[in-house]
Regions:
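A short, basic/flexible loop-to-alpha-helix module at the beginning of a structural domain
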Residues: 1-16, 173-183
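N-terminal Rossmann-like FAD-binding beta1-loop-alpha1 element of flavoenzymes
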Residues: 19-49
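N-terminal FAD cofactor-binding segment of flavoenzymes
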Residues: 45, 53-102
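Predominantly flavin-linked oxidoreductase catalytic cores and closely associated redox partners
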Residues: 126, 131, 135-296, 356, ...
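FAD-binding beta-loop-beta segment adjacent to the flavin cofactor pocket
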Residues: 310-341, 465-476, 489-504, 511
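Active-site-proximal substrate-binding core of FAD-dependent oxidoreductases
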Residues: 337-343, 359-404, 519, 524, ...
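C-terminal auxiliary extensions adjacent to catalytic cores
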Residues: 400-457
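Iron-sulfur cluster-binding cysteine motifs and their immediate structural context
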Residues: 495-528, 534-557
Length: 561
């Protein structure tokens, strides 16, 4: 990370703009569009650049997704007339309590309000982002797809003044290839970081500026998703199913989902809290098990799997949100922890956080300010409906950390009983007290999990799954997964925890092999398989793995996810 502009990278191209946004997700694009619309309405010239590491906006983003349209209604009131790919309203909610063989369908009258989706829509977030990017570009926003941000630039007073994009064309050993292109310095009056959960630059910023001081540790889950195409008689457009219980044990947070889209497609997935304790647990394998349950299998057993992906999700709630205000920058969306875990939704909260950031920055630019701390963003955030919603959803995962029974009871009290008593604001707050990387028990004190071999029709192996993600990385580039201490993977992870990275990674990136010459075990990193879920950066017991951005465009390329 550079401390000043007076570094040795004098050969870099430099681009200047008013506002730079890192990440073309719902938060980043909404901030860009709102800023540009405000500038256009006021007759002001405003240059806005959005960087995205994907080959095109939406290519590597992943969500369930059931979307609350509230924030989009505010940003683009006529989104339907503009052809937004939001076609399938939710028609029915089901909440299923699963055992290994049975299913309890919770009566509609007892479904907590946070699981109700009347007025919401089932969407492909990737398709929505492509459309939203088009809206932003039409308004005058510049989107640089295929460019990853790898460094943060500061002035002499440690104010953020922009970023550097990644070099293109280095060999695996770091030497330059023919046609090498140095990264570009992009300078801005304000920089917005909208990288999504566990953003690599946000991680650095939180540490550098102590943005998590006094906060509860952030808590994460992994969401694993498959897209299925099924016969018309198995498709029920608008049906939303959430499951809890099996296949996860009572100590593990999480649940399944099935969202029936409008074109004979079903989005199916499993969310697993990364605070799980059994190192033998494999979120990928638990997802495969979920599909074998009769209440799930009946919807897909004559279908075909056509998509696969995974992504970390932040769900620590308000108590775990870092301070989003930086000297010269802001954290927004899932980078700031705005997902509402209790509703299993983060699109509308990301959009709203981006809109609030746009308001704060636009007013600052009107006052001829730049590169200072936008404390008014925090004020506007706390005055919004977004903050009220996050407050009411903040206890969801912390309660489940105390066990499934307590989680059920307290969710029922907070999201069913209190609303019916006329109490709109939950009068207590529960906090997460442990980071996810310290929750594993030693392997020899944990029950080993044995998973069935895949049948290739309903259940699958990891490599055939990664193939469906359309992930591509140039093999001859520096490995983007950095190991700080080469001894830890063997002496601690393998010897104590049984090598959990082989199981928590949903893409087969990490593999323990015996060296043919020394006969010693070693960790092999198949970085070309990486689908950018960020789980290794979160769950590694000693925080010995750091996820960094590979070359721009080297990402999953999801279709319809």
């Amino acid at each position: 990370m550079n401390d000043t502009l007076s570094n040795t990278q004098q050969s870099r191209e430099t681009i200047e703009c008013d506002v730079l946004i890192v990440g073309a997700g719902p938060a980043g694009l909404s901030a860009a569009l709102k800023l540009k619309l405000q500038a256009n309405d006021a007759g002001k010239e405003l240059s806005i650049i959005v960087l995205d590491k994907g080959a095109e906006p939406g290519s590597h983003i992943l969500s369930g997704a059931v979307m609350d349209p509230r924030a989009l209604n505010e940003l683009i009131p006529d989104w339907q007339e503009r052809g937004a790919p939001i076609k399938q309203p939710v028609t029915q909610d089901k909440l299923l309590l699963l055992t290994n063989e049975k299913c309890i369908n919770l009566p509609d009258a007892l479904i907590p309000d946070n699981f109700r989706n009347h007025g919401n829509f089932i969407v492909s977030l990737g398709n929505l982002i492509k459309w939203l990017a088009g809206q932003a570009e039409t308004s005058g926003v510049d989107i640089y797809a295929g460019f990853s941000a790898t460094e943060i630039l500061y002035d002499q007073d440690t104010n953020i003044i922009g970023v550097v994009t990644g070099d293109m064309g280095r060999h695996r050993d770091g030497s330059k290839k023919e046609g090498f292109q140095s990264g570009i310095e992009i300078l801005a009056k304000y920089t917005i970081f909208a990288e999504g959960a566990r953003g690599s630059l946000a991680k650095e910023l939180i540490k550098k500026f102590h943005l998590d001081t006094g906060k509860a540790p952030q808590s994460f889950s992994i969401g694993i998703k498959e897209l299925w195409e099924v016969p018309s008689d198995q498709s029920h457009p608008g049906l939303v199913i959430h499951t809890t219980g099996w296949p996860l044990d009572k100590e593990s947070f999480g649940g399944g989902f099935l969202y029936h889209l409008n074109d004979n497609k079903i989005a199916l997935g499993l969310v697993v809290g990364l605070d799980y304790s059994n190192p033998w647990l494999s979120p990928f394998q638990e997802m495969q098990r979920l599909k074998t349950h009769p209440s799930i299998r009946k919807y897909i057993d004559r279908g075909k799997r056509i998509g696969y992906g995974a992504r970390a999700i932040n769900n620590g709630g308000i108590a775990s949100m870092p301070d989003p205000c930086l000297p010269g920058g802001l954290l927004i969306g899932c980078n700031a922890g705005t997902l509402n875990a209790s509703r299993i939704k983060g699109i509308h909260t990301a959009i709203k956080s981006g809109m609030i950031a746009a308001d704060a920055i636009f007013n600052a630019l009107l006052d001829n300010r730049k590169n200072d701390i936008l404390t008014e963003y925090q004020t506007l955030l706390r005055q919004s409906w977004l903050w009220q919603e996050l407050e009411n959803g903040s206890n969801f995962k912390p309660w489940f950390k105390k066990g499934r029974v307590i989680g059920f009871i307290m969710t029922g009290i907070e999201h069913w009983l209190l609303p019916r008593m006329g109490i709109k604001k939950i009068p207590w707050r529960v906090k997460n007290n442990r980071p996810d990387n310290i929750t594993l028990q030693p392997a020899n004190k944990s029950q080993k999990k044995l998973y069935d071999k895949p049948d290739g029709k309903l259940t699958f192996d990891i490599l055939s799954s990664v193939y469906l993600s359309n992930t591509w990385h140039d093999d001859d580039q520096p490995v983007h997964l950095k190991i700080s201490d080469q001894n830890i993977p063997i002496s601690i992870n393998l010897d104590i925890y049984g090598g959990p990275e082989e199981r928590y990674c949903p893409a087969g990136v990490y593999e323990f092999l015996q060296d043919s010459e020394t006969q010693n075990m070693r960790l092999q990193i198949n970085s070309q398989n990486c689908i950018h879920c960020k789980v290794c950066d979160i769950k590694d017991p000693k925080q010995n793995i750091t996820w960094t951005t590979p070359e721009g465009g080297n990402v999953p390329n999801y279709t319809g996810m």
